[in-house]
Amino acid sequence: MTSFMSRVWCKVESTGRQLPIVLNAVLVFSITAEVSYLVLVEAPFEPEQKKTDWSTIWTGLHLFAQYFMLGNITWNASLFVKTNPSIRGVFLGGDTLGQGWRYCYNCETHTPPRCSHCYDCNVCVLRRDHHCVFFGQCVGFHNYRYFLTCLLFMWAGLLYAVVMNAEVFIFILKEGVTFHSVMLLLVPWIMLVSGQVTTRAFAFAFIADTCVVGFLLVAAFLFFHVALMLRGQTTREWYSTRRPYSLGTMANIRECLGKNWYFCWLCPLIPSPLPGDGINFKVTASLEPKKQAVH
């Protein structure tokens, strides 16, 4: 009985970890479908305007831009989840342990500096930043590039979606700021359940609201992590005033994005080897010239 309940609990726990990924995927593809509809069906042409070659090219550019961003989001997210950031399968070193090494009683092994245990993943993660609940995976040394690039394209995609949904907001507010329009923008679910709006109006209002809220949240996450990258810090190290691992702006960027940092963000398949191994880190003090003793 205990074994059966244990297996059931493991299944429930596994499903719970996958649920945020599924919900994120549904939201991303719903927004993409809605923006595609706005571009293809609700194109901003006046009734008397005819479709020209330029309008066709413009529509094609719109579709290319949004599916380029969608492809980068899904690909980076997939590689982020698949890339193992933990100490599993990693040779951590010999008997000599340097400064900053600690013993993890959960993993029953010594761990290098900047490595910490994640109780959600139940393993220690190299240069652990935080556990990302949206993807059910820890952000660490080996998958930080995919996490940051995914955030970048999510921010760009949501900004694009907000601009494209401007017509939806204009349509809702065309009769002025009324109780009906405000409620539709703030709580579209209540308006749908109470029968005040159609399913179509609810869908457009809900997705437009999601784009705005999502854009603000992703922008905050992106700018915070860009600041961390430039400072050579993790989220855990942000609270400390010291920055022993900050090697300068360009070196900090290379530490996170790799050798080809300046163009690897365009596509997750572009190779960009990281300069370190996630175990040994240069510190600021090691870059300073040694002072000679004065006799």
From Swiss-Prot:
EC number: 2.3.1.225
Topological domains, Cytoplasmic: 1-20, 82-151, 198-203
Family annotation (InterPro entries): Palmitoyltrfase_DHHC, PFA4/ZDH16/20/ERF2-like
Keyword Transmembrane helix: yes
Extracellular side: 42-60, 173-176, 225-295
Residues covered by the DHHC domain: 102-152
PROSITE patterns assigned: DHHC (PS50216)
Catalytic residues as annotated in Swiss-Prot or TrEMBL: 132 (s-palmitoyl cysteine intermediate)
Topological type in the membrane: Multi-pass membrane protein
Primary residence: membrane
Reactions performed catalytically: L-cysteinyl-[protein] + hexadecanoyl-CoA = S-hexadecanoyl-L-cysteinyl-[protein] + CoA
Gene Ontology, cellular component aspect: endoplasmic reticulum; Golgi apparatus; membrane
Localization: Membrane
This protein's name: Probable palmitoyltransferase ZDHHC24
Organism per entry: Danio rerio
Gene: zdhhc24
